[in-house]
Amino acid sequence: MFEVNDVVQFNENHRWCPALGIIDEVKKIKDDTRYMVAVPIPDKGTAYIYALESDNSIEKIGKAVIVYGEE
């Protein structure tokens, strides 16, 4: 199980090129857990990707120390 601010590699089961992101939200749904992964896009902003724990499409890399928007 992942936590908010975990740094993850998101590969969507090899449908997309792997990307690094930060877990922004964790939500329990029925028998699964949904993660909202914030993926920074240079000069564009942030893309938000949803992934289910059952998909096995993300793996933990580490923990974010500095997170913008928090005080």
What are these regions (language model features)?
Residues 17-28:
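Short beta-strand-centered aromatic/proline hotspots
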